[in-house]
Amino acid sequence: VILSSNTHYDDSLLYSALAAFPPDEDGKEAKFNLLLWKEGHLYYTVIFPRSKHRPDCYFAEGSEQMLISPGALDMAGVIVTTRQEDFDKITEEKVASIIKEVGITVEEAEKIPGRYFDEKAKR
């Protein structure tokens, strides 16, 4: 979470933080989601690290398939379903499972500060 009242400082901090998250295997997409908002004079930025873009249930077949591809809002707890059938069958346990699946492990999270400070030292 980045909290700032100065957008210039916020931008600099954000770019350094985002550099700590390597892109996916194809090098096309960074593995994180961002949620940003402003309250009064404060800017809030929440970074959700990702291990993968879509959960296995997205590619499953038959009744196991759920077309849920978590974005920033989903990672923050507002689950978006594009099909009524997915809305009808999703459970709290399934949501937790999907978020855990596309999120990162504790071990991966512990590496982020080191990469952040390495990137910051390069600037």
Where are these regions (language model features)?
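HIT superfamily nucleotide-processing domains
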Residues: 1-123
